[in-house]
Each structure stands twice: as structure tokens, then as C-alpha cells.
């Protein structure tokens, strides 16, 4: 099974998402949002091809259905690298993944 690795930017994205939701819906509900996102990412371990193809070469995108986020990812050397976790309105050309 592939090992999930969050890039520093993906971890920073999660922190920002938590901070945003904490201010809007409270700490516990913000934590529930993050838990839901992480559970969706775990699904990729079993089904790494389930994300849609991206315009970025060698990258797929997991579209989160419960919350308005997209998680671009790629498989590299036995790792499932989560590159970012971004609002669905952000365009791939604006994504800084490195």
C-alpha cells in the first residue's frame, strides 16, 4: 500500500483551512472538517487512480465532495504525495506545488 506524504505546502493548507473554519464554525467543527479531508485522502491509498486527471503532467486531483477543496497528488517512488489542498476555485496554473 502506498504511504501518504503531505508536502509542507499541503500541511500549511490544512492549517489554513482549520484556522478559517475555526473562526467560522468553532474549534471542534473545524477539527471535524480536517478529519473528513484526511479520511478522503486515505481513500487514495486503496484507489490511487480515482482522482481526475490534472492539466499538470503526472498529477491527479482528488475532488472532495463534502467541502469545496481539491487535493492535487502524484505517486512518486511508492509514495502518494499530496501536493496541496486548495479551494476548488483556484486554477492549476496558480498552484505552486514545489
In which residue ranges do the predicted regions lie?
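Arg/Lys-rich, positively charged N-terminal/basic patches that mediate binding to nucleic acids
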Residues: 1-34
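Basic/aromatic recognition patch in beta-strand/loop cores that engages polyanionic ligands
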Residues: 38-39, 46-79
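Amphipathic, soluble alpha-helical interaction motifs
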Residues: 16, 20, 43, 47-50
Amino acid at each position: 500500500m502506498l504511504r501518504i506524504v503531505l508536502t509542507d505546502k499541503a500541511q500549511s493548507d490544512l492549517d489554513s483551512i482549520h484556522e478559517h473554519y475555526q473562526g467560522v464554525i468553532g474549534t471542534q467543527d473545524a477539527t471535524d472538517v480536517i478529519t473528513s479531508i484526511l479520511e478522503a485522502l486515505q481513500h487514495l491509498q486503496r484507489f490511487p487512480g480515482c482522482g481526475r486527471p490534472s492539466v499538470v503532467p503526472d498529477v491527479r486531483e482528488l475532488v472532495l465532495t463534502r467541502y469545496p477543496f481539491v487535493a492535487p497528488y502524484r505517486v512518486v517512488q511508492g509514495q502518494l504525495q499530496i501536493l496541496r489542498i486548495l479551494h476548488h476555485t483556484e486554477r492549476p496554473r496558480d498552484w505552486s506545488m514545489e
